[in-house]
């Protein structure tokens, strides 16, 4: 199940685990990324907690945790090569995997149609 936030994160949810990244729209707004800082595996976050940071040639921006949960995995490839986020933000450029505290909370996030409307 693919969901989105108003802060331009995407979540691919499988069971109780969500893979999280930033959307094409966010990447377009930021420009070329030059730095990515990811959370520690095992860290817990509340919804909208500051989970990661990205820096581009234009600006620095926070990446928020879309739901309550625990980080189970991070993507070291984007730390080594932030351009992966630019080239494939909703694929190889994922940020972290989050074990959701309450998977039903995802129902309150945006679906693809609602997100497209938000960014139109």
From Swiss-Prot:
Q: Which UniProt keywords apply?
A: Lipoyl
Q: What remark does the entry make about the cofactor?
A: Binds 1 lipoyl cofactor covalently.
Q: Which family does the record claim for this protein?
A: Belongs to the GcvH family.
What CDD domains does its record include?
A: GCS_H
Q: Which InterPro entries match?
A: 2-oxoA_DH_lipoyl-BS, Biotin_lipoyl, GCV_H, GCV_H/Fam206, GCV_H_sub, Single_hybrid_motif
| UniProt subunit comment | The glycine cleavage system is composed of four proteins: P, T, L and H.
Please give the superkingdom of this protein's source: Bacteria
Its recorded name reads Glycine cleavage system H protein
Summarize the protein's role: The glycine cleavage system catalyzes the degradation of glycine. The H protein shuttles the methylamine group of glycine from the P protein to the T protein.
As stated in the Swiss-Prot or TrEMBL entry, residues carrying the post-translational modification N6-lipoyllysine are 58
Q: Which PROSITE patterns match?
A: BIOTINYL_LIPOYL, LIPOYL
Q: Which organism is it from?
A: Rhizobium leguminosarum bv. trifolii (strain WSM2304)
What residue stretches are annotated with the Lipoyl-binding domain? Answer: 17-99
Asked whether the keyword ATP-binding is assigned, the reply is no
